[in-house]
Amino acid sequence: MKTNKILAIGLLAAATVLTTGCSDSFLEVENPTGEPLEDYYTTDEHIQEALIAAYDPLHWPDWGLGQYNALNIDGEIMGDNFWVGGATKTDMQNWHMLFNYEANENNTLGSLWTVDYSGIKRCNDLLKYLDWGTDVTEANRKLYEMQARLLRVFYYNMLWHYFGTVPFYLENLSEPPYTAPQYTADQVYAELIAELEAVIDSKVLPLKYYKTIKEGKEVDDEGQLGRVTQAMAYMVYAEMVMYQNDESRFSKALGYMKELIDSPSFRLNPSFANIWETEGEWCDESIWEINYEQTNNERGWGSPLAVGGTVLPTLISPNSFPGDDGWSKGNDGWGFMPMRLETYQMFSEQDKRRDVTCWVIAEDVEYTKRYQDTHIWLQKYRPYDKNFKQSSGDQNLNYNNNYRYYRYAETLLNAAELSLRTGGSGTGEAKTWLNEVRTRAGLAGLANVTVDDVLTERRLEFVGEGKRYFDLVRAEGISGASASNKATTALVPDEYGYRTNSWTAKKKYIPIAQGELDSDPALVQNAYK
């Protein structure tokens, strides 16, 4: 049973905003007692309620607000490792249209936009309430501030990756028409990277929170697992700098990666398979995870934003499955994100990651084959009975699989790439770091490492973790990337007739939803078509 419950609890102390449009309700905030906000948010306890509320939207993307937006699926469907699947081509039509680079204002990631702006709004609320806190120590005040600022960067980072040009504000809107200026992608990056550097330079956040052993059991004594940390900030920084191809900050990002590599707090889990087990959550390889909890859950189809588990395993498993040793007959999957055969075939037989990544179901096992079925599914987040057996809520919606967002393996591969791109030798530290990942996978080390080797290793290591598409896009700016690792040459029509359009630079930023355009006529749609 997992014990890290604090950050799986969603409080409603700070009311959410469910649109970024021009409406007075965007600013309405109520507190649990009905007393004036200035009087309520004065104590440390109440300030912490607002902080936990700022974390709450992290749990919403997989299902809520009318769309499924599991973060790894959103990050994989436009890439080259998976098909979209589902019942038909119109099941989650927005995913299918994004997959084929024909999305529009009515078929995009509309609810993800809302989730992220809800998180931003709650972070801004917390930062405002801190000014009212009279019963908060200065140390706690700084700790809460930096958590909120880093969370806010995280939410904006998702918006920046997908939409690029977005409304940007660091204080909630207080005057009609309650709209914010729309920044270009480069402007958003500049604002976020400066904010991120301020958080990092403050050195307020701990490098890591720890899972400890007590009475023979793993426990989280402080209830802190899931909070943002300095290490998580380093990973966001490297991710943003590399996606922007901001060479002026490569050395700084490399320094942050080296700090994590030199720290005794992080190491690769010796077992790649163990990472994906419940006991592997928050292991030494984990840098940051989003917690999902099967016990004490309140999440249901009528209350999708309540505390609970995740629907991800249901989404990505076969329909009407007859059962196996891990998942009983009668449980139901929905057939999204079947793995491409070519993805399975890219692993060598010696690669220990293959059978942990790929759930291959024998052809004689009968289940309801849905659209684009390949009999190969993502093993990392596949459903198991043990991951919902203590759930009191709707079963399909309450698996307890944490979402592994940043792993130490990514730190090593980030460092290898950044070293090479700042003039490092392919036989030096970059080789050491990349080969550490390969050795864990049971593969021979490389004698000389190139940037393209790192990109290829990233593909093998992170299948199904939502990173491949963004690697392909950013590799457009990497001179040493091969055709198989660049979006313009890898994301092209396939031989099966599923993808009929090619990726172009116009497809980097997806369309803004029509509802957002209607709520603010000043918003300019991305030039996607």
Question: What name fits each language-model region?
Answer:
Residues 1-20:
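Sec-dependent bacterial lipoprotein signal peptides
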Residues 22-23, 81, 116-119, 185, ...:
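Long, intrinsically disordered, low-complexity segments
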Residues 23-89, 189, 193-205, 209-213, ...:
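An aromatic- and glycine-enriched ligand-binding surface/loop that stacks and positions planar moieties
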Residues 44-52, 56-66, 85-163, 179, ...:
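Conserved, well-structured interaction surfaces
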Residues 92, 98, 339-407:
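Flexible, polar/acidic helix-loop-strand segments at domain edges
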Residues 158-162, 167, 243-247, 421-424:
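Short coil/turn linking the two alpha-helices of tandem helical-hairpin repeats
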